[in-house]
A protein has these predicted regions:
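Beta-propeller folds
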Residues: 4-396
Length: 396
């Protein structure tokens, strides 16, 4: 008896492209809900929602991401335009401002109801309260909308350029460019908003705000500011606000704690220690300004490398963009009201322990071993302990 020959299906490129995998997943804080995002190698992803029994309760496609609210009562999903639609519009050379935008779905887990907000440009969800902040439409529409997820309360603010929630504590910051229009004047500056207290002005100014950062509880807020946009690369100043009071200046480029010719840099994030007693920020040598008095073709373009240099020329080229943004960590002690420069050019790499609370920090440097590493392949480092009380490094 002849066995029937079975032809095996050949794996095609379409099969590979459509193969799905889990790219994101989360469990609600109360443990009763789970979502997972299933995405093909190329195509539209889907977010699936399951209850604690493993039953699928809802799905959202095409989806970009999802998050549970802190109360476990809502799932917030970002729905994006379908890939096929987007590609067809791009082939027609549709202008960016006419392309479809993302939607935000607020799904009530208990009521099995959803609310859709169209034309979302950006949004942020509070980690500790059921509050959402978002901006809609093109960049010309700078209004910020802040609302409770259940829709019980909402406010809006005009001419907003940046915003964000504190990690803990239901408080939001936003920066406003302001408006001089007679019919509706708006103050330019940095504000906080809390549902129970409303808006509070922390700093008034039409300049550039950078790297706004809360401490974990939202009681303190630090930021960089420059009154002149064109000078932001070289003239940023560091400010801090405590307990929603008007911000005060901590340091500017003239601070004696910094090496001569150094400035405060926007290329390192501002961050508080976990106990909010220290504020870490970045400094760097003042960047060289481009010579605008000479045409580019008239500038000398000579590249020189010496064999005694510790890093090969090709590696230097590869690292150039990163090195131009290199920063060196400094710290402000809120109790003593003093600033200390921790990292330096000779000891550039800093590690702190216990989320910045520990009395010790570790500085490392590979500069003495760079040339040796070219031949051996491995990179050695010198290590130094730095005591926060004396701030004098000791080799470890």
């Amino acid at each position: 008896m002849l066995q029937a020959q079975v032809t095996k299906k050949t794996l095609t490129w379409d099969d590979v492209v459509s193969w799905k995998q889990i790219t994101d997943k989360a469990v609600s804080d109360n443990g009763k809900w789970v979502f997972c995002k299933m995405a093909p190698w190329r195509g539209d992803a889907t977010v699936y929602l399951y209850n604690e029994m493993g039953e699928e309760k809802a799905s959202f496609q095409p989806a970009e991401g999802a998050s549970f609210s802190s109360s476990s009562q809502f799932l917030v999903v970002t729905e994006k335009p379908a890939l096929k639609v987007t590609e067809e519009l791009k082939l027609k050379k549709t202008k960016e401002e006419n392309m479809p935008m993302n939607k935000l779905v607020i799904y009530n887990l208990q009521a099995n109801e959803k609310e859709v907000i169209d034309s979302i440009r950006s949004f942020k969800l509070s980690e500790t309260a059921d509050w959402l902040a978002y901006q809609r439409g093109s960049k010309a529409d700078s209004a910020l909308y802040v609302r409770a997820l259940d829709g019980s309360k909402s406010v809006s603010f005009a001419t907003v350029t940046d915003f964000g929630f504190a990690k803990k504590g239901n408080v939001l910051f936003y920066t406003s460019a302001g408006s001089d229009k007679q019919e509706k004047k708006e103050t330019a500056g940095l504000f906080t908003y809390a549902p129970e207290n409303g808006s509070t002005l922390l700093y008034e100014g039409k300049g550039v705000f950078k790297n706004v950062s809360f401490d974990e509880k939202g009681d303190k807020l630090a930021f960089l500011y420059c009154a002149e946009k064109d000078s932001a690369a070289t003239a940023l100043s560091l400010y801090i606000s405590e307990k929603n009071a008007m911000a005060r200046l901590i340091a500017d480029r003239k601070n004696s704690a910094f090496p001569a010719g150094w400035v405060i840099s926007e290329n390192e994030n501002i961050r508080f220690s976990a106990n909010s007693g220290r504020l870490f920020f970045g400094t760097a040598p003042e960047p060289k300004q481009k010579d605008t008095t000479m045409l580019a073709e008239n500038r000398p373009n000579v590249q020189v490398w010496n064999w005694n240099e510790g890093i090969q020329y090709t590696q230097q080229l590869n690292d150039k963009a990163k090195e131009l943004k290199r920063t060196y960590t400094a710290v402000f002690n809120l109790k003593s009201n003093k600033i200390y420069q921790l990292a330096t050019i000779d000891m550039p790499d800093l590690k702190v322990a216990d989320e910045g609370n520990a009395p010790l920090a570790l500085l490392t440097s590979s500069k003495a071993y760079e040339k040796e590493s070219m031949w051996k392949g491995s990179l050695l480092r010198r290590r130094f302990r730095i005591y926060r009380e004396s701030f004098r490094p000791q080799e470890a």
